């Protein structure tokens, strides 16, 4: 216990022990960074939980971390240490450089993985759950995004941010998880609570997800799914799949928890009994190559100090320029939580699902630049609704890398104490253009559309290399045009 206490209350700030490299993930419980141990040079993953914006009690978080420290299995991401710095808790874990199974679906197998690969993945996950349940612990958030791969293509269960310990009463009564993967008893918040069998239901949904590319009912709104799940019959795996795969999914998706097989019993099912492959290294290598080509990056929900964003103490996390937010809702949700759109908007593309166009809104035609080089914009600055100005390029404007404070525009906002956010060496290609096109790639309905989106990204990269600053001016002109239209200067 003493070593754990030292781990939690280390006097050395974690920022002095680890060198943060990049943000590799974000979720409701914090941001995940790739980092390097300054002493051993070991690459690790660090989940930084912003306690100021978390509803979790620090002692409860500590209890969760203590039982995570007890897990020792090659099928579970290894826990290393936990430290506190300022208002953040740093949870240091083993780094899985191969990404997640969700990455495989998004970048290589949009219509589902081959059955033999799913069989291997689920076999490893089932073994991991068997170990976890034997330790009297529940994962509570099994899905493709939380099944991680290391550099060698081996499977590991990750993201234990919402895991729970099975108490002596063998039940949990907290409402945690992701709607499409939730077991009926979790959605109902039954009086008797739920046990490790909730993970078995989620395992069945995840198997379905890996085979078909999406979880069942994903075309419906998450709240509707939660409302109707207890009343619906269990989903069935239909299509050109083996009887073994269908039997496995059906075995997991039994509504009565007591009738579901345990993880131990699932290992005797034919679907996971006769696996033919031993790793997914070739897929991991391909995904890593694609991420390099796409200049893949994540924008943290709560950026660390001295990184991309610099802010005063008065600026709260929800007021950062969040590139992953949409105009559909004021609630920020992660990319994995976005439900697919099923009905075409009158203004949407035939091949692309778009929740962004408002009713009656149309797409303006593309205009050609007057020359191959760009000059500074000399027209007045249009103030954005986000509370930030775009550099006008006028003589009295501040440096290009700084967003100037607002003056009269503050009257339109409830909070007047928000200071300007400074952006240092901002990469418009990586953080805006590439980010947008990657989202469009993920939302494309067919391979042909994805091919065109990918070609478009290549053109932006090529143009930026030949005409430095192209993407910055491009984004600036779009913003200015939108604001002009809003103000009636059509």
UniProtKB/Swiss-Prot annotation:
Known catalytic reactions: L-seryl-[protein] + ATP = O-phospho-L-seryl-[protein] + ADP + H(+); L-threonyl-[protein] + ATP = O-phospho-L-threonyl-[protein] + ADP + H(+)
Name of the coding gene: SPS1
Designated name of the protein: Sporulation-specific protein 1
An MF annotation (GO) of this entry: protein serine/threonine kinase activity
Keyword Cell division listed: no
Active-site residue numbers: 141 (proton acceptor)
Enzyme type, top EC level: transferase
EC number: 2.7.11.1
An annotated GO cellular component: prospore membrane
Residues involved in ATP binding: 24-32, 47
Places the protein is found: Nucleus; Cytoplasm
Entry keyword set: ATP-binding, Cytoplasm, Kinase, Meiosis, Nucleotide-binding, Nucleus, Serine/threonine-protein kinase, Sporulation, Transferase
Signal peptide start-end: none
Upper taxonomic lineage: Eukaryota, Fungi, Dikarya, Ascomycota, Saccharomycotina
GO biological process: ascospore formation; ascospore wall assembly; meiotic spindle disassembly; negative regulation of protein localization to nucleolus; positive regulation of ascospore-type prospore membrane formation
Record domain Protein kinase: where: 18-272
């Amino acid at each position: 216990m003493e070593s754990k206490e030292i781990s939690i209350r280390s006097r050395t700030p974690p920022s002095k022990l680890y060198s943060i490299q990049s943000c590799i993930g974000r979720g409701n419980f914090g941001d995940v960074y790739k980092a390097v141990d300054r002493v051993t040079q070991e690459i690790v993953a660090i989940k930084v939980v912003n306690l100021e914006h978390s509803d979790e009690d620090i002692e409860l978080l500590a209890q969760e971390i203590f039982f995570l420290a007890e897990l020792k299995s090659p099928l579970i991401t290894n826990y290393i240490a936990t430290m506190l710095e300022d208002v953040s808790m740093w949870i240091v874990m083993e780094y899985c450089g191969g990404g997640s199974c969700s990455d495989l679906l998004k970048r290589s197998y949009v219509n589902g993985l081959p059955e033999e690969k799913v069989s291997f993945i689920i076999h490893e996950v089932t073994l991991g759950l068997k170990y976890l349940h034997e330790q009297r612990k529940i994962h509570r958030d099994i899905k493709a995004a939380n099944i991680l791969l290391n550099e060698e293509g081996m499977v590991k269960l990750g993201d234990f941010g919402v895991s729970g310990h099975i108490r002596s009463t063998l039940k949990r009564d907290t409402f945690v998880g992701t709607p499409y993967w939730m077991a009926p008893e979790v959605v109902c918040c039954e009086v008797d609570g739920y046990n490790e069998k909730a993970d078995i239901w989620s395992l069945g949904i995840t198997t379905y997800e890996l085979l078909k590319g999406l979880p069942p009912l994903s075309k419906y709104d998450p709240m509707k799914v939660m409302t109707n799940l207890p009343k619906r019959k269990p989903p069935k795996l239909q299509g050109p799949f083996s009887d073994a795969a269908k039997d496995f999914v059906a075995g997991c998706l039994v509504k009565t928890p007591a009738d579901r097989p345990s993880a131990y019993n699932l290992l005797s099912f034919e679907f996971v009994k006769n696996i033919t492959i031993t790793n997914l290294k070739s897929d991991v290598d391909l995904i890593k190559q694609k991420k390099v080509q796409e200049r893949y990056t994540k924008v943290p929900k709560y950026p660390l100090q001295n990184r991309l964003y610099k802010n005063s103490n008065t600026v709260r996390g929800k007021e950062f320029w969040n590139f992953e937010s949409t105009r559909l809702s004021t609630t920020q949700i992660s990319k994995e939580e976005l439900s697919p759109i099923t009905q075409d908007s009158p203004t949407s593309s035939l091949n692309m699902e778009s929740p962004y166009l408002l009713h009656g809104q149309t797409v303006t035609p593309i205009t050609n630049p007057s020359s191959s080089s760009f000059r500074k914009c000399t027209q007045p600055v249009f103030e954005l609704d986000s509370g930030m100005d775009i550099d006008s390029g006028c003589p009295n404007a501040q440096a290009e890398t700084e967003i100037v404070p607002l003056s009269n525009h503050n009257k339109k906002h409830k909070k007047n104490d928000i200071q300007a956010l400074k952006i240092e060496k901002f990469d418009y290609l990586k953080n805006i253009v590439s980010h947008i096109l990657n989202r469009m790639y993920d939302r494309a309905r067919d391979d042909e559309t994805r091919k065109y989106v990918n070609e478009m990204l290549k053109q932006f990269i090529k143009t930026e290399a030949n005409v430095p600053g192209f993407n910055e001016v491009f984004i600036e002109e779009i913003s200015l045009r939108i604001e002009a239209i809003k103000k009636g200067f059509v």
